């Protein structure tokens, strides 16, 4: 492993670098110190993880938008779909289950780029936790907006305030956990069936004395 990388004080973000922080050179070419470099690198890791989880969720939402009774993908858990539709104020009474699914999918896809408001799934969190997020100003907005904000803010000549970098990292992390990942999980259950407890058989052959099983 790279010792400089483990310390987090190497920056490869812009074309003028890479820059490495040492006692003799405490700042990079753009003026970033070790705190800013570590913060930028961490923020970009958060953005990458959020993009990965959330783009998976986007594909699942597109799949549900194309689901049909005789198609390759069908609705396996209608009850969970109805529950989610009601949470999102989607009309369900007297409607075909696939019409409901398509509208719910459209609402979910808006979570990635909507211009106003915060993530819909935040209201599923404990009220006390929602209050903390609101007071800290880290309620995630549109998923793609949070990722783009980090990529923009960590570029050369932009944010050099470590507190701001950590703040946006927290907000983007919540966009992952309480938006992208929630969409991916709930929609997967609706399309493929909610996992249930099952029984299986195993013997001592699955255990190894030198491993934690």
What is each stretch, according to the model?
Residues 1-213:
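Metallocofactor- and cofactor-centric catalytic cores in central/energy metabolism, strongly enriched
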